[in-house]
């Protein structure tokens, strides 16, 4: 099975209780857990290079999460590597490593690599989890992400999110501006362009399976097309010609339908499209602007923003358009709601005005309408912060962040991520300006 990582053995070692308390990643801010990712044993030079690179990726994944503090290899005392021996735990405790990762890489006759790892609790001197993976060389990075995911899940109790992709809009800094749909790993690696930049493109969206995307393309000023692109084959097809559309559709959880906003006759409304028949069904009524629809994880409800009461606020309705309820009640204008994959929170952009002008904010609120009076929480603010999207485990939010032009530097737009708690804000490196991020589910 080329180009697919598969697990030979789902669990190599029995899981035992351990001294470390499970990290609560929703409430408060905990000190990062110190972890040593030891050099991976290798049976030849090719495996050694691969192992060295994998250790860097695993360490970086854990560090970026904000929940782990990888210890520098320069401080390691024990020199043994691999999974065939029991570590000298006292040596690892001496450098304050609560967790230890040992691993090995072997090149198989098939040309693939067998990668094994064990996560140890150095305090109780117990194995926590271990696995064997078999991968082709070109997927070594995904194998490293898979290992980091397993470590993250074991310690936090939540699924990891490292083996994922981000699709976004890349914009050149030179004039004329060229916008292209781009795809990269969650950490900014393996960036590649999916469109050629000949037309204006906006708001890429993943399908549930992460092997397809939607995006909006302005073929001409009057002709706006929605494309569906297969990421495995590269083939594109036109979903429809929607002159009044402003954002790409969002897929339903079952992948059979999608929702979008379309402007007609002075009003903008939410429509659902059946992807098989291409038939549209209007979900909102009345006057005003209704935009940015997003399904709940179970597909039974839709959140969107509407100015039906004068100022853009957030509303929830059933997926058939019934039982509309307002869920935002704070001052300012709300936009771009995004439902967490866990179903518990909705992320949003909020624009407020003060003496210094407009301020953009990213916030979260509970998805239950009756709980929402004064329950929203702002997690980051700036000159321009917008387009929040969720990690597949619902614990990290990615968004676009912009700065204005000045006499010293031109304006710029970049992609950032931040924890649900509002801590650990970090930039996701891209080769050019970037906006409109969308996070895939965990890859198969």
Curated annotation (Swiss-Prot):
Recite the UniProt keywords alphabetically.
Cell cycle, Cell division, Periplasm, Signal
Gene Ontology CC entries for this record: periplasmic space
Q: Which GO terms describe its biological process?
A: cell division; protein import
Keyword GTP-binding part of the UniProt annotation: no
Signal peptide extent:
1-19
Q: Which domain of life is it from?
A: Bacteria
- Major subcellular location class: periplasm
A single Pfam family it belongs to is PD40
Q: Where in the cell is it found?
A: Periplasm
Q: Does the keyword Nucleotidyltransferase apply?
A: no
The protein's role, per its UniProt record: Part of the Tol-Pal system, which plays a role in outer membrane invagination during cell division and is important for maintaining outer membrane integrity.
Could you tell me which HAMAP family the record lists for this protein? Answer: TolB
Q: According to its UniProt record, which protein family does this protein belong to?
A: Belongs to the TolB family.
- Oligomer status and interactors: The Tol-Pal system is composed of five core proteins: the inner membrane proteins TolA, TolQ and TolR, the periplasmic protein TolB and the outer membrane protein Pal. They form a network linking the inner and outer membranes and the peptidoglycan layer.
| Identification of the protein by name | Tol-Pal system protein TolB
- Organism of this sequence: Rickettsia rickettsii (strain Iowa)
